[in-house]
């Protein structure tokens, strides 16, 4: 069915969930950890493991708990209907605080116009509540509560989520070894507590993006002293894509581990698309409001006004957008600094504001109206993601005067946001060679006083179109280790075209690898549990456990099947690369058995003799490739 024919039918009648996104992972189950009140139920994924084969000791292996961003979609006990949206997680928490009110209807002019247009009925999400807003004079941001000494339900929720049943894992022996990390000055505790979360938010070192109108949200935290997070981008464009396809991209992305999702739609029906996305999203949704504002003036940047932009902010805040990218650091005086660059201004939002500044020869209205923007943000608890509109678009332009000038301005704006108790993170590059990455991180920590850093990569070289998920994954792992709090994924299609589902998955898995590698290097508590469990499964030839413990079980299983497709290969005591005679792990096990039988320490074994004897034994037993387990 074409996009056009889909839109001819009411989406509220026809929309369906992407079936691939709602399949539970093999040997995994959704578990919920109870908080201090019955409605704090924190979801995690528990991976059940096989018993160690008798040849290797026959021990029971405890299940491994992993962070889960997939929301109710992978819970077989939940009925998913994208036409109705996800269940309500947060309304009771918000009601109990008593500082918000229901509005009689939408406040934004544009929202009212869309609601009154009968032509949009077929596209409109059918179950929309009137929005909330802070009561007059109130501030409903998580930072405001934190600075008042209040531990909110959201703070407790993320503390439980970050720990991932760490105490149980330690008791089960899943963390017998974890290398000490080097955190470059971060203050990572041995256990994440609700009070620690509150302190980090009050300090501005972390944010919980959680708009009061996004009640379907499962809260998460972004900060250098927590697990490194990743963001995935979706959104339609003038080239096409339906609302249903964008919801499918959302559910597919969070299945594979996207901690937040940015809707970067620039095509038709941006307002309606966003409503469907938010109502079906368990993760924070971010936007770049200037994109929609530009659509409202038919793409003519010079026609943008503060009044129109303000209306756009209110429109999106009342829908439930959790964080806004605001390019308020693109100042008139910085624009000429980009003239000698190889790639000029590559940020879409940055180029829009630069064009407006030059056309009017006035200062950026996002900068001059920043206090007014803060007033809107704290009325809905929308977090800032201060955009790097002058980020380098090539390694030749990295760390130049324009980039760092804007960064200093973003530091200034961060302090203004904090005066309003508005949560804030900072966006970063971009394209940066490896030797310059740490300077970026250090400069951001200095200028922005440790506000969370959120970077696009960075890409470490410009010579690999089609492989920029790899060029950027290298930089992402490095900057994550140095202190970056969230990494924006890059797909293989970067610079080339619009990503499809496979590209989205590839980008997310690449960035999950980078984020996890950074967590290991920083020494985040419990980060090595999954590595240890998978390594043990690999050594014991528990093939299914190896697949299921991996970030992408489907691909791992398919690769193994290409070489050894039969079920019997899943219990083989050798790997698919080396075969039975050259498998180092099989040989090591046999050397250990020899040492145990001889009652001597394995390190004292005559390795050559051991290998020779075991090779002879293998031949005498008929060179059997498989053993019953």
Curated annotation (Swiss-Prot):
Residues 1-13 have a biased composition (Polar residues). GO terms for molecular function: 4 iron, 4 sulfur cluster binding; carbon-carbon lyase activity; zinc ion binding. Keywords: 4Fe-4S, Iron, Iron-sulfur, Lyase, Metal-binding, S-adenosyl-L-methionine, Thiamine biosynthesis, Zinc. It is an enzyme of class 4 (lyase). Substrate binds at residues 233, 262, 291, 327, 347-349, 388-391, 427, 454. One of its GO terms (cellular component) is cytosol. Homodimer. This is Phosphomethylpyrimidine synthase. It comes from Pseudomonas fluorescens (strain Pf0-1).
């Amino acid at each position: 069915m074409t996009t056009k024919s889909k839109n001819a039918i009411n989406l509220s009648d026809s929309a369906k969930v992407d079936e691939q996104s709602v399949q539970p992972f093999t040997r995994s189950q959704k578990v919920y950890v109870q908080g201090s009140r019955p409605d704090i139920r924190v979801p995690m994924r528990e991976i059940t493991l096989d018993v160690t084969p008798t040849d290797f000791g026959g021990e029971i292996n405890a299940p491994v708990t992993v962070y889960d961003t997939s929301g109710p979609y992978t819970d077989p006990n939940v009925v998913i209907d994208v036409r109705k949206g996800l269940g309500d997680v947060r309304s009771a928490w918000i009601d109990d605080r008593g500082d918000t009110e229901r509005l009689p209807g939408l406040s934004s002019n544009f929202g009212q116009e869309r609601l009154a247009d009968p032509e949009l009925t077929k596209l409109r999400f059918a179950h929309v509540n009137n929005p909330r807003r802070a009561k007059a004079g109130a501030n409903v941001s998580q930072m405001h509560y934190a600075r008042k000494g209040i531990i909110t339900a959201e703070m407790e929720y993320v503390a439980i989520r970050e720990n991932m049943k760490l105490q149980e894992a330690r008791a089960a022996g899943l963390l017998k070894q974890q290398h000490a990390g080097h955190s470059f000055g971060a203050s990572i505790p041995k256990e994440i507590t609700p009070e620690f979360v509150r302190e980090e938010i009050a300090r501005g070192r972390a944010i919980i993006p959680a708009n009061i109108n996004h009640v379907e949200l499962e809260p998460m935290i972004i900060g250098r002293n927590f697990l490194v997070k990743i963001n995935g981008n979706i959104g339609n464009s003038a080239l096409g894509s339906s609302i249903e396809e964008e919801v499918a991209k959302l559910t597919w992305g969070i299945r594979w581990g996207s901690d937040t999702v940015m809707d970067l739609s620039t095509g038709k029906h941006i307002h309606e698309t966003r409503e469907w996305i938010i109502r079906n999203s368990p993760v924070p949704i971010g936007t770049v409001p200037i994109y929609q504002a530009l659509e409202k003036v038919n793409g003519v940047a010079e026609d943008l006004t503060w009044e129109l932009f303000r209306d756009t902010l209110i429109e999106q805040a009342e829908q439930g957008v959790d964080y806004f990218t605001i390019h308020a650091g693109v100042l008139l005086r910085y624009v000429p600094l980009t003239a000698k660059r190889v790639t000029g201004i590559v940020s879409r939002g940055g180029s829009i504001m630069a064009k407006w500044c030059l056309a009017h020869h006035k200062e950026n209205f996002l900068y001059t109206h920043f206090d007014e923007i803060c007033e809107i943000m704290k009325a809905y608890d929308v977090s800032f993601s201060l955009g790097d509109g002058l980020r380098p678009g090539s390694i030749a332009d990295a760390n130049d005067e324009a980039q760092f000038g804007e960064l200093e301005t973003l530091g200034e704006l961060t302090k203004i946001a904090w005066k309003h108790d508005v949560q804030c993170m900072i966006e970063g590059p971009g394209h940066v060679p490896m030797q310059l990455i740490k300077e970026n991180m250090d400069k951001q920590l200095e200028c922005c006083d440790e506000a969370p850093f959120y970077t696009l990569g960075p890409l470490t070289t410009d010579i690999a179109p089609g492989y920029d998920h790899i060029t950027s994954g290298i930089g992402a792992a490095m900057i994550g280790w140095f202190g970056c709090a969230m990494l924006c994924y890059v797909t293989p299609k970067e610079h080339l075209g619009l990503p499809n589902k496979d590209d989205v998955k590839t980008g997310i898995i690449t960035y999950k690898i980078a984020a996890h590698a950074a967590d290991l290097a920083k020494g985040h508590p419990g980060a090595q549990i999954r590595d240890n469990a998978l390594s043990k499964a690999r050594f014991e030839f528990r093939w299914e456990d190896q697949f299921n413990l991996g970030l992408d079980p489907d691909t791992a299983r398919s690769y193994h099947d290409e070489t050894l497709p039969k079920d019997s290969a899943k219990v083989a005591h050798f790997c698919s690369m080396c075969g039975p005679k050259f498998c180092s792990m099989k040989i090591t096990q046999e050397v250990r058995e020899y040492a145990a039988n001889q009652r001597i320490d394995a390190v004292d074994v005559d390795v050559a003799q051991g290998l020779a004897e075991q090779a002879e034994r293998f031949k005498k037993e008929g060179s059997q490739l498989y053993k019953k387990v």
